[in-house]
């Protein structure tokens, strides 16, 4: 139904989640076998291939947000999800660097690795500490914004994400889609954050050069 609604609205990309039948196995203890993980990816494919086939018929793309609790949450799991689907042409990713950075994933390399599968981009920032904290990467069952946490989402430009390199990488792969602000900062007024984030995107975004920097020296 979502694909049909997108078609009627003239939307060519749907962003969403798939969930994961194997997220509970993340820590691999009690012991998890490779077959259990493979079965999880095959179950994901069994459920989503018919959906993606319908998307393809309608000319709509599905962009999975790479995110903890999903079947794809870092570069390797995203690659495995893509392979489980047989590299289905309707399947790609919603790129959100905030969910990669605090995990220690190379979020710029992710863009190059999936250069033809970045269907949508979330501009979202996150801060992570350079010193040990009481609450680690898994979140410790404390609320966002708690100062004991190792990481917290922040307004654009106030976290640790290097958006300069992200824009350069997106330009390098020829990305032409939207830069959609997803704003979260539990310590900041929403309206203030929305305004400054929009300005941040306007300032950080730039078009790639159509010429080499030394093109003026070329002989005519």
Where are these regions (language model features)?
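Active-site acidic/histidine proton-transfer and metal-coordination neighborhood
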Residues: 1-93
């Amino acid at each position: 139904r979502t694909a049909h609604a997108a078609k009627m609205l003239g939307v060519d990309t749907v962003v969403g989640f798939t969930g994961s039948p194997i997220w509970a196995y993340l820590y691999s203890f009690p012991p998890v076998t490779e077959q259990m993980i493979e079965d999880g990816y095959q179950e994901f494919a069994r459920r989503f291939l018919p959906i993606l086939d319908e998307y393809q018929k309608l000319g709509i793309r599905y962009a999975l947000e790479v995110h903890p609790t999903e079947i794809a949450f870092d570069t390797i799991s995203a690659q495995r999800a893509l392979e489980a689907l047989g590299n289905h042409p309707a399947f790609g990713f919603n790129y959100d660097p905030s969910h990669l950075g605090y995990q220690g994933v190379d979020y710029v390399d992710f863009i190059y690795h999936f250069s033809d599968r970045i269907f949508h981009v979330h501009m979202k920032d996150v801060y992570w500490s350079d010193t040990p904290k009481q609450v680690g990467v898994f979140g410790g069952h404390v609320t966002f914004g708690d100062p004991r946490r190792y990481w917290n989402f922040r307004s654009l430009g106030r976290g640790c994400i290097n958006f300069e390199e992200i824009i350069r990488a997106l330009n390098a792969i020829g990305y032409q889609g939207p830069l959609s602000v997803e704003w979260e900062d539990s310590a900041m007024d929403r309206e203030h954050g929305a305004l400054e984030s929009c300005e941040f995107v306007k300032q950080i975004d730039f078009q790639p050069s159509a010429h080499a920097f030394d093109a003026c020296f070329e002989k005519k």
